[in-house]
A protein has these predicted regions:
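Pyridoxal 5′-phosphate
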Residues: 1-279
Length: 279
């Protein structure tokens, strides 16, 4: 959401106000209340991720909508879709974005749910498809595949959460100096973002990969960008600790054996990572 907003700042003269978060990664609702009270008549849109794709922290969207009043509220629910209860009606948002690739569907297809009372400018002009918002012949196979993937319901949230809790408990037992980012907030079942003091995430990532364990240093949409996570910086990390963090993801096909294997290699990885950081 940040990149389109920043584009509007650079090219359309818009003003962007980034709402701070707490150390747990939850939106600072008091700040938002003050902002709306002071400048509500100037605000065109409030846009908040339903859950963060790096930490899994779930935002209080319904409360944001209440604070916003008549201001339109958009939520990017791509990460949350099928992973946690998600009701467009109950949240009360103006619009919600979803994507197929997060639920096992094809890349390049998604959905924008928008209240009928609102009209938005066309992204592409032409034949008038997609209610004249996005012209072009509809990709029927991808649409059908998206619907099938969303309906399959193969993701068992309770099972995945049990695996995550097993992983985090084992991790903290073997590496007591590590800490889980967003642990005090409501989180998605399958994401664990961990900081390992005294290490560098790039080194840890290579070591984990050599041990046949897949993890990441941040979101896939920023992969390959060697800079501290803006998410962790917003949560109060300095650049050093932000670059000492890894994201572990568990999915529908993850097993207890996967978790136990990852835990078995972590002590060696952390030890070697700290040694490399001291050179």
């Amino acid at each position: 959401m940040l990149d389109p907003a920043r584009w509007l700042v650079e090219h359309e003269g818009a003003e962007l106000i980034e709402i701070p978060v707490t150390k747990s990664g939850v939106l600072d609702l008091d700040y938002l209340k003050g902002l709306v009270a002071k400048r509500g008549s100037e605000i065109a849109l409030i846009s908040v991720m339903h859950s963060n794709n790096e930490t899994g922290v779930i935002q209080p969207i319904a409360e944001v909508v209440k604070i916003a009043g008549s201001i339109p509220v958009h939520t990017d629910a791509v990460q949350s879709f099928t992973k946690t209860p998600l009701s467009y009606k109950e949240l009360g948002v103006t619009s919600m974005a979803l994507s197929a690739h997060k639920v096992g569907g094809p890349h390049g297809i998604g959905a924008l749910i928008l209240q009928r009372a609102y009209e938005i400018p066309a992204l592409l002009h032409g034949g008038g498809q997609e209610r004249e918002i996005r012209s072009g012949t509809l990709n029927a196979p991808a649409i059908v595949a998206f619907a099938a993937a969303a309906a399959s319901k193969i993701y068992e949230a309770s099972k995945v959460q049990e695996l995550r809790e097993r992983f985090e408990a084992g991790l903290l037992s073997s590496a007591p100096s590590a800490y889980i980012n967003g642990v005090d907030a409501k989180r998605l079942p399958g994401i664990s973002n961990v900081t390992f003091p005294g290490t560098q995430s790039d080194s840890l990532l290579l070591l984990m990969d050599s041990m046949k364990v897949s993890c990441s240093t941040g979101a896939a949409c920023s992969a390959g960008v060697h800079r501290p996570s803006h998410v962790l910086l917003a949560m109060g990390h300095d650049e050093v600790s932000a670059q000492s963090s890894l994201r572990f993801s568990l999915g529908a096909n993850s097993t207890q054996a996967d978790v136990d294997f990852a835990l078995s290699v972590l002590p060696t990885v952390i030890e070697r990572g700290r040694a490399a950081n001291q050179k």
